[in-house]
């Protein structure tokens, strides 16, 4: 079910980005989209194994949360996982050896709903596993409804596709101004993918942007970035396993 929903969100935002593009000119299915989808398919089995394995084997957490009503279970689980993802993403940009792997994601020179699938396997492992481990260590979720954790993870998947989408949004619309008070969007996340290294190290939040505002990592500009990608002089080819990163030393972020 998770794979079906993820695919549905990506198709929706791909089509919207093609029909109402923020940056026009890219065909609906291009080389980057096909590469990202292939890479995501290769990592899907690993994702399922991680989720099932980690959630099944972790001991009960420090904070008893099993008696919470379902709506509170979703809220607490969502906030904790999103907060953990913010800090893992922050480390990806601040720790040089993590950036070596994370820059595969930033190698995309155009944005679309599949860009979130463009990940080195090492980057994928730590970004997926660490938040789940922290979640399991902090919260005792025995007694939680079985649909709560898939729901929380599903929100993250949908927002990941949305924030990378090449969709032109009406920045002045009333509903978008309300949305932008707390939630991520392509307008906000675009600056995280700028080729300008001085502006790229910010906007780390996945679903909520309140973490960036709280910890002063928010980057906002009136116009969209002039270019996306990395500018270290080492062009990253569409290599699903990105073995060249294990042979070359990438420049540190920023």
List where the protein language model places each region.
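Structural signature of hydrophobic alpha-helical transmembrane segments
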Residues: 1-15
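Membrane-water interface of alpha-helical transmembrane segments
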Residues: 3, 29-32, 147
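Membrane-interface helix-loop junction between the first two transmembrane segments
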Residues: 15-34
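Membrane-interfacial loop-to-helix junctions in multi-pass inner-membrane proteins
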Residues: 29-34, 64-72, 76
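Membrane-embedded catalytic scaffold of the fatty acid hydroxylase/desaturase
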Residues: 41-50, 68-226
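Membrane-interface helix termini and inter-helical loops of multi-pass transporters
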Residues: 56-66
């Amino acid at each position: 079910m998770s794979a079906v929903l993820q695919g549905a969100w990506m198709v929706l935002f791909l089509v919207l980005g093609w029909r109402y593009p923020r940056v026009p000119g890219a065909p609906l299915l291009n080389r980057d989209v096909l590469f990202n989808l292939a890479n995501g398919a290769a990592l899907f089995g690993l994702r399922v194994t991680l989720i099932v394995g980690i959630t099944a084997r972790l001991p009960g957490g420090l904070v008893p949360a099993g008696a919470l009503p379902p709506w509170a279970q979703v809220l607490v689980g969502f906030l904790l996982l999103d907060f953990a993802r913010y800090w893992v993403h922050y480390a990806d940009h601040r720790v040089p050896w993590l950036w070596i792997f994370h820059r595969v994601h930033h190698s995309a020179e155009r944005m679309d709903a599949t860009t979130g699938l463009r990940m080195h396997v090492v980057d994928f492992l730590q970004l997926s596993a660490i938040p789940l481990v922290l979640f399991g260590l902090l919260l005792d979720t025995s007694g939680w409804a079985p649909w709560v954790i898939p729901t929380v993870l599903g929100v993250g998947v949908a927002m990941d596709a949305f924030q990378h989408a090449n969709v032109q949004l009406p920045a002045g619309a009333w509903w978008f101004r309300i949305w932008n008070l707390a939630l991520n969007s392509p307008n906000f996340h675009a600056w995280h993918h700028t080729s300008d290294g001085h502006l790229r190290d910010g906007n780390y939040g996945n679903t909520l942007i309140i973490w960036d505002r709280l910890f002063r990592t928010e980057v906002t500009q009136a116009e969209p970035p002039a270019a996306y990608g990395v500018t270290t002089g080492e062009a990253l080819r569409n290599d699903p396993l990105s073995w060249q990163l294990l042979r070359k030393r990438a420049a540190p972020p920023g």
